[in-house]
């Protein structure tokens, strides 16, 4: 399958965090739409699905994969990309929009937890 260049594959993990996280996902989608971000999104459904979905996105040719979730979802997505059959895996950009409970990865790397700024950084 060929994906239009520049189109993001977005994985939303609704299990990360609380009900507030689900409301925030709606805001994130609306913001991406208002900024003209070209993306397809998939929603994880349970244990192991983020890893599987990231592998599918990589195999389908997405060059930017964005995780909307927490530390566990980010880890699973990286594992999914690396275990995929995608060519040039090292050229796949992975982005994180922190949307979990702890977001330790984002805090350690001083990534802003505000999704609008995260989206700006990913776009660059």
Question: Which residues make up each language-model segment?
Answer:
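ATP/NTP phosphate-donor binding region
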Residues: 1-68, 79, 116
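Phosphate- and divalent-cation-binding pockets in alpha/beta enzyme and binding domains
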Residues: 52, 76, 104-105
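Short, hinge-like loop/turn segments at secondary-structure boundaries
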Residues: 58-59, 84, 111-114
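Short glycine-rich anion-binding loops that position phosphate/pyrophosphate groups of nucleotides
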Residues: 70-73, 99-101
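Short Gly/Thr/Asp-enriched flexible loops that form oxyanion-binding sites at enzyme active sites
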Residues: 73-86
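Residue-level signal for well-ordered alpha-helical positions
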Residues: 80, 108-109
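Short, acidic/small-residue loops that bind anionic groups at enzyme active sites
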Residues: 86-108, 116
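Residue-level detector of conserved catalytic or cofactor/ligand-binding positions
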Residues: 117-124
